[in-house]
Amino acid sequence: MTRNPNKKPNPEIHIFHNGEVAEFDYFGDFAKFLSDNDARVIVRNYHKRTKGKAPWQLIDEAVRQRISKKDGDQVWCVFDIDDYLKDAREKFENGLKKAKQHGIKLAWSNQCFELWLMLHFNQVSTSVSRQDYEKKLQNLFKEIDVDYHKNSLQLFHKLLPLQPKAMQRAEKIFQKDQPQENPSTSLFLLIEELNNFLNQ
């Protein structure tokens, strides 16, 4: 088949994570879901060189990759706030500025990615520790007959029917450019961006 030289290439979404497993698997499954549904987008998931990095180091790595933003391509950094903001505020804030300068979009969760998972079941309006998220999620997943643990596979597919509610709840507690607010997450902005390609 002859390739049409005038056909616009599919945009690419480059996602950098600093989490150990859960985020990488979640967005890997999301990418496959988009591909299976003929979405006109390519999702590239980066994890090997960035897991365990502080948010500003994650942003540095994304900048180092020198990814072009042509043809609608985007670069996102997905990270937990944890204690980074409290323990290294200057480095954290400088990282946010650097991301803005280089057109890198941020999908953060305060305190952690588990907040996003929790929002599929309930609204969260008070601060919750990482340990408490684990306990609460185990009980909530039992309600949908899923044995949850931190590195559970296929979380994306298991939670997909509940995603619209999670989006609404995340937006309700989100404050732009205020990652210090706990609980809060901008992760829904990346989810929204990816979902937009399903409707094109």
What are these regions (language model features)?
Residues T2-H14, F24, G28-H47, V63-Q200:
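C-terminal accessory helical subdomains adjacent to catalytic cores in phosphodiester-
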Residues G19-E23, K51-I59, N182-S186:
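Phosphate/oxyanion-binding active-site loops and adjacent basic polyanion-contact surfaces
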